[in-house]
Amino acid sequence: MKFIYPGSFDPITNGHLDIINKITSIVTGDNPVSVLVMNSDTKKHMFAHEQRIEMVKKTLKQHMPLFNVEGFDGNINDYIESQWPKYDVIIVRGLRNNTDFDYEMMYETFTRRFSAQTIYMTPSPENIFVSSSLVRNLINTGADYDDLVPWI
């Protein structure tokens, strides 16, 4: 079984790290989790793809070898099939609120067609409102965001 945790991580936040810490309780070093840093032409990113990959690698340094960080372009299902065709793949996703739930149900409907299963984890209460969008807004307005990101 292969666990993957995909996201744009633009930037990685304490909410992402919270989910990653929870993942460590269900996996072993025999089969590291692949953290997939997605790049999409349809999304406008604040940080370049390579920057986001490096941020995630720096953040997860303490958790290696439980995790490996990979970047990819394009469709998640195509990527899964090209990398792990003989594995049963489990996609890990974080859920904070009803908006996330609605989006994830649509996303799972798409990924389920490709036989990937999805498990959902919720962040700790102190991270329930932390999002990359919030951090980007704070960065753009010059507000303090240090307590929302692990890589400062």
State where each predicted segment sits:
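Nucleotidyltransferase catalytic core that binds NTPs
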Residues: M1-I152
